[in-house]
């Protein structure tokens, strides 16, 4: 059974009050690697932190059968962040959740639980697992096609390129979310870019990659 640090819960409640947070997105990753979630209002936050929020797990692909549908999303207070691209009035925050069964046990199909279980096994063998991914992606002119925004190549430096400005903004947004960035640069293909994240423990990085 997972336990939450009471001080961490109080910190989240304080931060939500001080920053005019109205909505909290409860995120989790399904077994296929897709980001899922739902939003609650700040009035439900304390109850969610202490007991989780119920949802129909049978509607999530790869989770459970319809006759076993009750699951609970238990937010991890250590993942609380205010989303910087949302308005500051009635602000929006997010937390990643552990998925629990009605009897309070971790759900076996929860990706986060699978990772934590294997990290615990590694820890018992004396290993600590750190991850430092290089996130590569493309900028396109719009979401309906694949027309590149630039025709640069590896490590090109063009301060006036719109893609460079977009990459800069991406780095600043990640840092606003408390995600440390080591470096960023243009990659080999036109409009291909890379942001290198500073290494950290695997569970934190898994949440970070889903945020990214």
Residue ranges and their predicted role:
Residues 1-212:
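Glycine-rich, acidic/polar active-site loops that bind/position phosphate-bearing ligands
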């Amino acid at each position: 059974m997972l336990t939450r640090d009471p001080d961490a819960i109080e910190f989240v409640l304080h931060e939500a009050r001080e920053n005019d947070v109205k909505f909290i997105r409860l995120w989790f990753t399904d077994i296929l690697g897709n980001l899922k979630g739902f939003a609650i209002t700040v009035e439900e936050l304390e109850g969610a932190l202490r007991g989780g929020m119920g949802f129909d797990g049978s509607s999530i692909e790869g989770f459970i059968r319809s006759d076993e549908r009750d699951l609970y999303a238990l937010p991890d207070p250590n993942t609380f962040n205010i989303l910087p691209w949302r308005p500051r009035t009635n602000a929006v925050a997010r937390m990643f959740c552990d998925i629990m069964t009605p009897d309070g046990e971790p759900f076996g199909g929860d990706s986060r639980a699978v990772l934590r279980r294997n990290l615990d096994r590694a820890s018992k063998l004396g290993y600590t697992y750190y991850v430092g991914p290089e996130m590569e992606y493309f900028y396109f002119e719009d979401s309906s096609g694949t027309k590149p925004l630039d025709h640069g190549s590896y490590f090109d430096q063009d301060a006036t390129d719109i893609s460079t400005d977009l990459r800069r903004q991406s780095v600043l947004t990640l840092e606003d979310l408390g995600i440390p960035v080591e470096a960023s640069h243009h990659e080999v293909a036109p409009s291909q870019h890379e942001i290198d994240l500073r290494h950290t423990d695997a569970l934190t990085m898994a949440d970070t990659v889903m945020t990214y």
